[in-house]
């Protein structure tokens, strides 16, 4: 949800601090529901259902975020990001728990490192891809909405500064262009969530309760 604060700044006209506060439902739900999933997994034993549910909820939440409009109210942007955060939280610790359950004791450390490395690398890569999509879509939309205006007036000013660079008459069209660009970026996590469901459905179904520490050879 790296680009949700950008939507708040550009479309809703808030500053960076306020956009961070408005993004707290997503951050909070990820934290709370990751702990819930981990706790229930330790009690019930199976991690696979949470990973599957995570993919489904992230796809639904991300899909709803693509429907945000300039005039979307609190119910929409609060509810959509909260649902997406629940999905992210349910699957947040799943891969690490799976590695710790499936691998042999001597391979767990390497497996956990690989999981964290892949998550960090892929996350950084997707942010870069999303930024490219945002920039290209914004330029395209501005040319459609305001063909006689230099789009650099908006892009150079940034998400929170363009309002002082455009006229009051042009502002509604700029907001439409920005909204369409940011919501287009949300299709990326939707696609990734749908793709992750394939892996979630075929992941080995094991219980963490069956993992026993093996005595070291003397």
Functional labels for PLM-detected ranges:
Residues 1, 33, 96, 108-114, ...:
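Generic preference for well-ordered alpha-helical elements
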Residues 3, 149-153, 157-165, 169-170:
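Mature extracellular catalytic domain of secreted serine hydrolases
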Residues 1-110, 203:
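Transmembrane core module of solute transporters
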Residues 35-39, 63-67, 132-140, 198-209:
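Structural signature of transmembrane alpha-helix termini at the membrane-water interface
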Residues 12, 44-48, 137-142, 146, ...:
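Membrane-interfacial segments
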Residues 160-218:
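Transmembrane-helix exit segments and adjacent C-terminal regions of multi-pass membrane proteins
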Residues 77-154, 184-188, 201:
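Small-residue-rich alpha-helical segments with characteristic i,i+4
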